[in-house]
């Protein structure tokens, strides 16, 4: 939790429309939905919403990896998420 608060301070200074901020926002939503779904396993609407958000984040990360690999690596490390699989 402390790591997220430090990251949130960093991202508040950046532009809200940036790819990094959007990925950060989606990551927070994903973590909240994941903890919700651990308690409510049969909440299928939330499961669908989680899958949609995961897809959006995956597309944004793929775009960032293609455009700027250094910023992509930094963001992955800061948010503590795995690198997307490439074909």
Swiss-Prot record:
HAMAP family hit by this protein: Ribosomal_uS15_B
A GO term, aspect molecular function: structural constituent of ribosome
Cellular localization per UniProt: Plastid, Chloroplast
UniProt record, GO biological process: translation
Main localization, broad class: plastid
CDD domains for the chain: Ribosomal_S15p_S13e
UniProt entry tagged with the keyword Membrane: no
Protein family per UniProt: Belongs to the universal ribosomal protein uS15 family.
Protein species of origin: Atropa belladonna
Keyword entries, A-Z: Chloroplast, Plastid, Ribonucleoprotein, Ribosomal protein
Name of the protein described by the UniProt record: Small ribosomal subunit protein uS15c
Record-linked InterPro entries: Ribosomal_uS15, Ribosomal_uS15_bac-type, uS15_NS1_RNA-bd_sf
Domain of life: Eukaryota
Subunit structure: Part of the 30S ribosomal subunit.
GO cellular component, one term: ribonucleoprotein complex
The encoding gene: rps15
SUPFAM superfamilies cross-referenced by the UniProt entry: S15/NS1 RNA-binding domain
PANTHER family, A to Z: RIBOSOMAL PROTEIN S15, BACTERIAL AND ORGANELLAR, SMALL RIBOSOMAL SUBUNIT PROTEIN US15M
UniProt KW Coiled coil keyword: no
